[in-house]
Regions:
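A donor-sugar binding/catalytic signature common to diverse glycosyltransferases
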Residues: 35, 179-181, 342-390
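Conserved catalytic-core segment of nucleotide-activated headgroup transferases in glycan assembly
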Residues: 242-326
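C-terminal amphipathic helix plus adjacent low-complexity
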Residues: 1-14, 216-265, 395-479
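Conserved nucleotide-sugar donor-interacting segment of glycosyltransferase catalytic cores
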Residues: 154-209
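Donor nucleotide-activated moiety binding/catalytic core segment of transferases
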Residues: 149-163, 283, 306, 315-366
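Histidine-anchored nucleotide/phosphate-binding helix
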Residues: 29-52, 184, 288-302
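A short, glycine/small-residue-rich beta-strand->loop->alpha-helix junction that serves as a flexible
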Residues: 25-35, 172, 277-283
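Conserved N-terminal ligand/cofactor-binding loop architecture of enzyme catalytic domains
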Residues: 1-19, 23, 42-152, 199-252, ...
Length: 479
């Protein structure tokens, strides 16, 4: 049943030997290193000439080392080098010292902008701040400058490797943050293909030739290639509601007591999303519906004959940016009730209560479709081309849809999505699955405890900065 597992990724046979550069990004993160080096070894076994590049910084700033720790850098370098060498893989260190700035090739303005987008993506994801807040925070702004400098030098070094080695393809894990985006920028600059690697929600490897895993257009094409298996979908959506299988269902176990909706023509549930998650994905994910508070307030005011229940996403509880103040006006309206990020009311019961479900791109959209609910989805998402919800382009279209008696969309593509979630992955020879997670198969990632220690230390530093950013944001709002 593994639709994409019979022929994992384009792997040339010996007669079509290719030169492939695989960059080892995020060396402190176990699954990233596991998938990257397992993939590199498999490519080499298939007859390809493979070289593994890695960051040679001594006190660099990146997505796994925002604190710029020299110890973390030492662990990163040694982890990649020793693990790769044990696998018989050639390694190439990428220099990031000051001398790189004076070397050719130059970095184009468009390439610098792409690096900066990668920096912004990483910073937003880690510190949970929206772009405006991160610009105001001096500590985060300083981190961004160091991160940009490090990634820019990595790009120059990678371009030099590409010029020298003339590879046929570059591969890298993820490709979203600056420290994994620069290989893709180098590939595009040289006019050669790239491949990105990732891990699925069920902890299996996935290979994306020519696109990144957050490319929603390509991912939706992949989803649509799956069968609409009703039995698989039934099991998948039922399991999602079980506390033992879904961390959000586990947190949201409080019984939903519906408000008195007598006198209202329609019951609307509104499910918000974490704005920072969309902001971190780049310009392709820019939404015309980003200002949630005013949008919801307008809908409530224009439709006094409808009852609106608004559910914050639990992930919004950890955001450093202030997401609650924009909903102060909504909280005073007679036809609105708000459930905040830390509220534990059952989201599925809230969805079932509704006549129409409104989302800002969250997974409840596809859950609503499968449950036979009419759903309106505002903004881009991994489901916006699956025909599982109504997708207005403007506020006016949204208002018109709210006032219509909408019919539920066909659940066929919701079933395809379930099959995609359950079975879509690309098995790798040197990766084994325990039933819960991935482990090495036939090799060993070096320095596991040192890597975990360095990662935990950086997490503590980042959490402290995030708390400070949160405090600063709220202080400005109350001033």
């Amino acid at each position: 049943m593994d639709v994409h597992s019979s022929d994992p990724s384009p792997q040339p046979s010996h007669p079509t030997r290719e030169k492939v550069v695989v960059h080892a990004a995020y060396p402190l993160w176990r699954k990233h290193t596991l998938v990257t080096l397992a993939r590199a070894k498999e490519l080499q076994d298939a007859g390809n000439q493979v070289a593994v590049t890695y960051c040679n910084a001594t006190a660099g700033t990146c997505a796994v080392n925002y604190g710029g720790s020299p110890i973390a850098c030492m662990i990163c370098r040694n982890r990649v080098k020793k693990t790769a060498e044990a696998l018989g893989l050639e390694t190439i260190p990428l220099s990031v010292d000051g001398s790189v700035d004076k070397q050719l090739p130059e970095i184009l303005f468009s390439e610098k902008r792409a690096v900066m987008e990668g920096v912004q993506s990483g910073v937003i994801s880690t510190f949970r701040t929206l772009p405006e807040e991160s610009r105001r925070n001096p500590m985060i702004a300083a981190i961004k400058r160091r991160y940009f400098r490090n990634a820019s030098r990595l790009l120059k070094s990678m371009k030099a490797v590409v010029k020298d080695r003339q590879p046929d393809r570059i591969e890298v894990f993820n490709g979203r943050h600056a420290c994994s985006r620069f290989p893709i920028i180098a590939a595009r600059s040289a006019g050669i293909p790239f491949t990105t690697l990732e891990v699925t929600a069920r902890q299996f490897p996935i290979v994306c030739p020519g696109y990144m895993v957050h490319d929603r257009h390509q991912i939706q094409e992949r989803i649509l290639s799956h069968p609409a298996d009703v039995d698989v979908a039934e099991r998948y959506y039922l399991r999602n509601r079980q506390p033992r299988d879904n961390k959000y269902a586990r947190k949201h176990r409080t019984a939903f007591v519906p408000p008195d909706a007598s006198g209202y023509r329609k019951r609307i549930s509104v499910f918000l999303s974490s704005q920072d998650e969309f902001e971190s994905l780049g310009k392709e994910w820019v939404s015309p519906f980003l200002n949630y508070g005013p949008i919801v307030e307008k809908a409530c005011l224009e439709n006094p004959d409808m009852m609106f229940l608004i559910r914050f996403h639990p992930n919004q509880a950890d955001m450093a940016s202030d997401v609650l103040t924009p909903f102060k006006a909504v909280s005073t309206l007679p036809n609105a009730q708000i459930f905040y990020p830390t509220d534990t009311v059952n989201s599925y019961a809230l969805m079932e209560w509704s006549d129409t479900v409104v989302t800002f791109g969250s997974t409840i959209t596809i859950e609503a479709c499968w449950a036979g609910k009419a759903a309106i989805m505002l903004g881009p998402s991994f489901y916006d081309q699956l025909e599982i919800a109504y997708t207005p382009k403007t506020l006016e279209e949204f208002g018109d849809l709210l006032r219509m008696d909408l019919k539920p969309k066909s659940p066929e593509n919701a079933a395809r999505f379930a099959h995609f979630q359950e079975f879509d992955h690309d098995p790798l020879q040197y990766v084994k699955h325990t039933g819960r997670t991935m482990i090495e198969n036939g090799f060993r990632i070096r320095h596991p405890w040192l890597g975990q220690l360095a990662r935990t230390t950086d997490d503590l530093i980042c959490n402290a900065i995030k708390l400070w950013a949160n405090h600063a944001s709220r202080s400005r709002k109350s001033a």
